Swiss-Prot record:
Family: Belongs to the TrpF family.
Keywords: Amino-acid biosynthesis, Aromatic amino acid biosynthesis, Isomerase, Tryptophan biosynthesis
EC number: 5.3.1.24
A Pfam family of this chain: PRAI
UniProt name for this protein: N-(5'-phosphoribosyl)anthranilate isomerase
Family matches, as SUPFAM superfamilies: Ribulose-phoshate binding barrel
Superkingdom to which the source organism belongs: Bacteria
Known catalytic reactions: N-(5-phospho-beta-D-ribosyl)anthranilate = 1-(2-carboxyphenylamino)-1-deoxy-D-ribulose 5-phosphate
Pathway membership: Amino-acid biosynthesis; L-tryptophan biosynthesis; L-tryptophan from chorismate: step 3/5
């Protein structure tokens, strides 16, 4: 079954929603974003998060020491690097599960996968607005050219209305959603519920 990551949790309500709906992963954003949380906030959230839901930290071009501090204090299960990090940088985190985001404009971007040894690639849409969380989708057909030595986490513009089609086309390890389960910029319980049910109903 395809796994679900709900990204950008930033309120206690979001944690309560996750505890009820049990996504496989939840994401805390530590980069510049309207969904950004700091370590103090995240520590409070983690205290209230049910066991079994894996914690992902999202980072963009952060100093190694800062990432390590956050990862160790929160006991993060996955480090998601969404910026211009190199393999040399990623090698600092050999004791962690690492997902590397690749922003997709064309098939040429898939060549970047050859530069990394990571646990999964998160394919996201490219946007001039910034790194991730844009709510924009890309042409999933591009991923037909990807040779699947490393699992795929599909991101970018996913929502209840298109996630089934995306899964059937890409067959990812996991799907990642943020703005697609929000109303007015905040996580919405019913949208989260519908999205998770839709994903888990795909055969």
């Amino acid at each position: 079954m395809v796994k679900v990551k709900i990204c950008g949790l930033r309120r206690l309500e979001d944690i309560y929603y996750a505890n009820q709906l049990q996504p496989d992963f939840i994401g805390f954003v530590f980069s510049e974003s309207k969904r950004r949380v700091d370590l103090k906030e995240a520590l409070e959230f983690v205290k209230r998060l049910k066991e079994g839901i894996k914690k992902v930290g999202v980072f963009v071009n952060e100093p190694v020491e800062k990432v390590m501090e956050i990862a160790e204090k929160l006991k993060l299960d996955v480090l998601q690097f969404h910026g211009d990090e190199t393999q040399e940088y990623i090698d600092n985190f050999k004791n962690f599960t690492v997902w590397k985001a690749i922003r997709i404009r064309s098939k040429l971007d898939l060549k970047k996968t050859g530069e990394f040894k990571v646990d999964a690639f998160l394919f996201d849409s490219f946007s001039e607005k910034g790194y991730g969380g844009t709510g924009e989708a890309f042409d999933w057909n591009i991923l037909k050219a990807y040779k699947r030595e490393i699992p795929v986490v599909l991101s970018g513009g996913l929502k209840e209305e298109n996630v089934e089609e995306a899964i059937k086309l890409v067959r990812p390890y996991a799907v990642d959603v943020s703005s697609g389960v929000e109303v007015g910029g905040y996580k919405d319980f019913n949208k989260m519920k519908s999205f998770i049910e839709k994903v888990r109903g795909v055969v």
